[in-house]
């Protein structure tokens, strides 16, 4: 297994996952010594900086221990790892990966719960919502289309502008921290509308995700979202 240099996921996270897989499948047994960082860099054709970042993640996760002069040793078997996508949102994920992202805001408007039914979302009927439609691009290439419904009972008087959303993470603007989400993911072929928005062919598979996002300590979602994403980005979520 090699790192994918065309992927949006940082190389060090890919390398972290690869090593975790090798530990889980027994290629690197518990107590075994890992190759040196220079050997890893040569094997995977990555820089030593990338390897050091992956090593730091592995050490912080308690998966390996490293002593100067004696190398690195596998000290625990990871139960599961995930990389590429978190509950913080795609903008923050990619900013943390030092990837420049462009937000193209298509619409911001008040909506009612029944308006979300066309997007396959079931929202509490008595609440009011702020709807956001946007496209995300990397290097001028669209990769994600989102239809977001924000429950205004969490954000009384909320006003958002396209200009603010183009340059700042939505969660930063809302001043919220999410600690959990419920997602239903399915593979689809794009509609004509999605082909146009994402500039893709009709036979290009997409992942369609229905998501409910929760604030820490809250029982009801503050955000309901239907988003479509190219598998090159989201496909790196493996398991927990």
Swiss-Prot record:
Which key words are in the record? DNA-binding, Repressor, Transcription, Transcription regulation
For the keyword Transcription, the answer is yes
Q: What happens when the gene is disrupted?
A: Null mutant gains the ability to efficiently use exogenous aminoimidazole riboside (AIRs) as a source of thiamine.
Q: Name one GO biological process term.
A: negative regulation of DNA-templated transcription
| Superkingdom of source | Bacteria
Instruction: Write down the DNA-binding region ranges.
Output: 37-56
**UniProt-listed SMART domains:** HTH_GNTR, UTRA
Query: What Gene3D superfamilies does this protein map onto?
Result: Chorismate lyase-like (3.40.1410.10), Winged helix-like DNA-binding domain superfamily/Winged helix DNA-binding domain (1.10.10.10)
**Could you state a single Gene Ontology molecular function term?**
DNA-binding transcription factor activity
Q: Where is the HTH gntR-type domain?
A: 9-77
Recorded protein name is HTH-type transcriptional repressor STM4068
